Structures are given as C-alpha cells and as structure tokens.
C-alpha cells in the first residue's frame, strides 16, 4: 500500500476508476486474496492433504498461476520500495532455514514440492499487501474477500451440507454438526472467521460502519458455530489487548501485554511438559490438564528433538512419516502418534522439523519483530487503525499456534493470515497511509 490517491477523482468517476492502473491493482489483490483462501478445492475435507500432493494437477496449475500472477503484479503495479521493504533480514534467514530443512528432508523432491506451496503462499500475501495504493483500496480488498469467502461458506451450509458441515460420516464423527464452510476443518474455519471479525472491526473504526458491523457479526456467528472454544476466547482477548491500551492513552501497553500473553501461554502449555517446577505444580493442582492429549505429543516430540536438536528431522519428514509409523504405541499413551499429522504446537514443530536454531529465529521473526514494527507505526489515524488490525491477527495466530500447528504449512489459511499480519505490520510501520473518501 503506497500513499497516492485523489478524493475528487474517486468521487467524480467511481466506475472508470475501476479500470485505472490503481483500480486494476486493487482488483487483482482482492482476487488473489479470495482465491488463495477459498483454495482450488473448496468443500473438500481432503483438500488440505492434496494441497501438497505433487500429482494433483489442479493444485499444481492453480498455485503455479497464483505465483506467476503475483510476480507479474509486483513488477507491473507495485511500488518497488514497498516490495523491497516487505522481506526483512530475519525473514530471509527464516526462509533460508526452510530451504535447509528441505535439503535435510528424507525425501527432498517431495519436500520441495510441499515447500513450493508455502513459498507461493508467502509471495501471494506479500503481493496482496503491496498492490493496494491506500487505505481505501485496501478496505475494498478486505470487503470483497470477506463477503465472497463468508458468503460461499454460508451458502455451502445449505447447498453442500455434507461438505460444509462436519458429519457423523466424517473422519472425526465427534465433531458432527460443527461448521467448516469452504474449509477442510473447523479448526481452520474458526481462526479464519476470527480474522474476518478483526477485519470488520477495522472497517467499522475507519468509518465504514455498515460493512464493518455486517462482516464482524457474520464472522462471529460462523466462528461460534465451529465449536472452537479456544478461538472464541482468543478473539475478545486479542481485541482488548490491542484496542484498550490505545483508548486510554497507553499505546505502549499493547506490546507489553502481547509479550506477557505469549510468555504466559508458553509456560501454561509447553511449560507443563518441559519445565520441571511448572510440571510439578500442574501435576499437583491440575492433574487432568493435558489439552485433550496434546501433552503426550509434546513429550514425544521433545524426546525426539533431543536426538537431533541442531537440524531437526527435515521439512515434512517427521509427523505421518515411516519414522513414526514404525514406532510402537504404548497402551497408556493418550494419542496414537503414528496417525498424527502435526504436533499441535507450531513452535515445537519448527524445532522438530528445522532445529532449535531455526526456532530461535522464528521467535524473533514471528514474535519480537512485529512488536518493534507496531511501536514504529506513525501516529496517524489510518496507520493506527490498520496497524491495530494487523496486530490483532498476529496476536491471535501467535497464541493459537501454541495449540495448533500451521507454521510453513503450505497454503494453510491460518498460516496465510499470520503472514498477512506480520508483513502488514512491517509495511504500515514504514510509511504514512493516504486517506480518500469512504464509500
């Protein structure tokens, strides 16, 4: 998003503006955002697995096209300064660890195919942020994407109920009746709708009351029907942590509360497994606290990580691989690790797949750098509103990652929104946002 735009020109010729250079760039950003969230296989519970399947021609062509369109759009429509500013040194180092983990994988060609989807997803999110010229154009992208994705999800409940809803015939019959919309699982649908609720709040705060309130309410209703208690709790928590300090004139409180929330969550989750004092207290006062069996996975992952702490096991080379399929399953283990596709903790999974050094870089890139960017945001209304939106997304996803694993997971919508929030914070911290008339 750069800082060009004319209020009079927009008011005088709204239709013709859609066919200008800026109008085309905005339309491309909206279409890219919508397509990558809906995916090329909507309403298919198996779609998440097929995303990385090298033999899936639909995904190969689809994501290849997204990558090509993104590169062309960046070259043709984006401000080169904006493009150069998106990738920081820490992000380049993080991507270098990703490439190294591909080389270290048990099947490098397959890992490279999966990583290519991840890289295309990152490229696409960067393009979506770089193309809109100002806050008004960005708002149009948000409105279009929210309406289409949520509209398809709601329509799917009626037209494709067996695909848009978890049923007793699903792999997890205990989730029967819970909503998932166009997505593959309720645990993806819930966080995506949470991010749309943040988008609605952003639109409402900048003056687009009707769009903002409608998107916020529709997203919250859908999110509540996914049955995700964690998501339902994190949404108001994220909003309060970001918005409240600014309202009382203590904007510095947001990064402080962010850091405290991350530390507390880390101690309350991984701490009860890996920190002896915390583990003792948890066993004493909360003996049944296992996060639905996740602590079993974390203990096992920690034991395996101790064998390869520096390099990990390689990208796509741990969960669901022969390494675990050939493991014995103790009778008292809560979950069968042989059938698990990820460790239900994104930070631990980074260490297991890429090594502890990569985890250290990830902590800085994903948790510390966004706080620095947030504090650098110019104190202008549009920058503050947009920065708060990106911070809500980043905080929500960062906390959610302690119970779910989506970092570098191909084109996972939750991962894409997290990238969106981090890149967005960096971009909005570097330049003032222009203002045009609200529509």
Task: Place the predicted regions along the sequence by residue.
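Membrane-embedded alpha-helical segments of multi-pass membrane proteins
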Residues: 54-74, 115-124, 188-197, 233-240, ...
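Transmembrane signal-anchor hairpin modules in multi-pass inner-membrane enzymes, especially those
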Residues: 1-100, 130-140, 207, 427-439
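Alpha-helical transmembrane segments of multi-pass inner-membrane proteins
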Residues: 66-70, 98-99, 139-174, 181-247, ...
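Hydrophobic transmembrane alpha-helices and their immediate junctions
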Residues: 130, 208-210, 244-247, 256, ...
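Transmembrane alpha-helices of multi-pass inner-membrane enzymes
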Residues: 387-439
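Long extracytoplasmic/lumenal interhelical loops at the membrane interface
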Residues: 283-299, 307, 311-354, 373, ...
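A membrane-periplasm/extracellular boundary helix in multi-pass inner-membrane enzymes
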Residues: 154-161, 225-226, 243-289, 302-307, ...
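Aromatic-anchored transmembrane helix interface
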Residues: 87-96, 108-130, 141-146, 192
